[in-house]
Amino acid sequence: AYKVTLKTPDGDITFDVEPGERLIDIGSEKADLPLSCQAGACSTCLGKIVSGTVDQSEGSFLDDEQIEQGYVLTCIAIPESDVVIETHKEDEL
């Protein structure tokens, strides 16, 4: 399993995600995360990767430049390593 740490306005939340599992499937039970479409087509769930890698290829909202800057759509992100993500970043776009 990969260790996921979400840095939320309410503090850090850490949990394990199995390979191939979307972090939101566990994360939404652990934290009050902003969600809307849950399909990677909007920016409600936007976060920023501090460390680690995720697969967010299902998403359509972010362009390559935003992804290179570390932005991530947490609703579709599948961790590919231990990962630390700052949540609640929609206002930055």
Swiss-Prot record:
GO terms for cellular component: chloroplast. It comes from the Eukaryota. The keyword Lyase does not apply. Its cofactor is [2Fe-2S] cluster. GO terms for biological process: electron transport chain. [2Fe-2S] cluster binds at residues 37, 42, 45, 75. One of its GO terms (molecular function) is 2 iron, 2 sulfur cluster binding. Keywords: 2Fe-2S, Chloroplast, Electron transport, Iron, Iron-sulfur, Metal-binding, Plastid, Transport. The keyword Plastid applies. Residues 2-91 form the 2Fe-2S ferredoxin-type domain. Pfam families: Fer2 (PF00111). Its main location: plastid. It is found in: Plastid, Chloroplast. CDD domains: fer2 (cd00207). Binds 1 [2Fe-2S] cluster. Belongs to the 2Fe2S plant-type ferredoxin family. This is Ferredoxin-2.
